[in-house]
């Protein structure tokens, strides 16, 4: 357990000799769909019902919660805890107490400083997938901050970049009977996320191919203009000036990983090596955008 959290915080810096070939970096993302309905129809949505709430910090005055997904199962005892099933923010003191309880239960002692080992908004496993159509694609963009992939794509990641990721099972909860190639139905409410409530559902989820959640463990150095001006001594929230931050990747920011987050964002970035490897398998429902 301690090793899992350590991998989320470890940083590896590399130096580059003169004459090294300039690398390209790519953001991986979903294709552009005709409509939000098509997006929801193909990709569905992923739910993590258990997680840490947001925090109201009395030191910096900010109310916030992050989007980190942990590969750690929520302990059964906490699955009915009001502050684990609701993201509604609580005070910094309450948050610190809840974190200490969880770290004791999970036997996390190597990174036990409050707001470092665990953070506001952290989400636990398990996760549940609802897709209004029968999922066929290699990539499903059902979750921010992680990848939902077919078994063959999961196997490629485990083989080529196991030190950069960890893999969690996805529990398939609701799946529609229709093929995603058909036009998406218009839900009565008009909201794309409600399509799942108005389509015929496959009764036997075991008929659906397995999907897996890939969690990215690494991140780049800070982007130009994105170095935090300060970090709150209470909740450890970094203060980044979004007006000066540039959403681009440079070679100086790279730490040697094949897949990683662009620091201060949820943009998933990959190297040329990763792109070339994945493209050999002709994956579906993914695009590479130079960043």
Regions found by a protein language model. Give the residues of each.
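Residues immediately within or flanking Cys/His clusters that coordinate Zn2+
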Residues: 51-57, 229
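Short cysteine-rich clusters marking metal-coordination/redox-active sites
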Residues: 57-60, 232-235
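Cys/His-rich microdomains that often coordinate metals
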Residues: 61-64, 239
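Short microdomains enriched in Cys/His and/or Lys/Arg
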Residues: 74-106, 242-272, 277, 281
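Short N-terminal edge-element motif at the start of the domain
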Residues: 97-143
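Extracellular-facing segments of soluble proteins and assemblies that are Gly/Ser/Thr-biased and enriched
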Residues: 145-147, 154-217
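Short coil/turn motifs at helix boundaries and re-entrant loops, enriched in small/polar
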Residues: 147-153, 268-273
């Amino acid at each position: 357990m301690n090793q899992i959290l350590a991998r989320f915080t470890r940083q590896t810096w590399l130096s580059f000799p003169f004459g090294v070939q300039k690398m390209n970096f790519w953001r991986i993302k979903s294709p552009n769909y005709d409509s939000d309905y098509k997006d929801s129809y193909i990709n569905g949505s992923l739910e993590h019902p258990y997680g840490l709430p947001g925090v109201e910090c009395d030191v910096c005055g900010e109310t916030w919660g992050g989007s980190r997904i942990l590969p750690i199962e929520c302990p059964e005892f906490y699955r009915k805890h009001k502050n684990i099933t609701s993201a509604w923010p609580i005070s910094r003191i309450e948050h610190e107490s809840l974190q200490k309880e969880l770290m004791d239960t999970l036997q996390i002692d190597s990174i036990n400083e409050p707001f470092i080992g665990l953070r506001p908004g952290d989400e636990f496993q398990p996760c549940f997938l609802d897709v209004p159509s029968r999922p066929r694609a290699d990539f499903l963009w059902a979750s921010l901050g992680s990848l939902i992939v077919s078994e063959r794509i999961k196997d490629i990641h485990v083989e080529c970049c196991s030190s950069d990721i960890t893999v969690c099972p996805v529990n398939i909860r609701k799946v529609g009977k229709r093929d995603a190639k058909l036009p998406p139905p218009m839900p009565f409410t008009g909201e794309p996320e409600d399509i799942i409530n108005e389509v015929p559902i496959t009764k036997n989820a075991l008929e659906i191919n397995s999907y897996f959640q890939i969690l990215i463990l690494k991140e780049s150095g800070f982007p130009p203009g994105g170095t935090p001006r300060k970090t709150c001594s209470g909740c450890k929230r970094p203060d980044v000036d979004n007006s000066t931050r540039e959403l681009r990747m440079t070679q100086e920011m790279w730490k040697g990983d094949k897949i990683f987050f662009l620091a201060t964002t949820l943009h998933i970035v990959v190297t040329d090596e990763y792109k070339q490897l994945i493209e050999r398998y002709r994956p579906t429902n993914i695009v590479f955008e130079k960043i």
